[in-house]
Curated annotation (Swiss-Prot):
Chief subcellular location: plastid
Mode of membrane association: Single-pass membrane protein
Species classification: Eukaryota, Viridiplantae, Streptophyta, Embryophyta, Tracheophyta
Record protein name field: Photosystem II reaction center protein T
Source organism of this protein record: Saruma henryi
GO biological process assignments: photosynthesis
Length: 35
């Protein structure tokens, strides 16, 4: 049970950081990597 909570917290924090960076600047690097 504890492991599940810790993993959930880790994923949520990573998601928040990713969204913050994604919305702060346009995804120019991401589009270049995919293409």
């Amino acid at each position: 049970m504890e492991a599940l909570v810790y993993t959930f917290l880790l994923v949520s924090t990573l998601g928040i950081i990713f969204f913050a960076i994604f919305f702060r600047e346009p995804p120019k690097i991401l589009t270049k990597k995919t293409k």
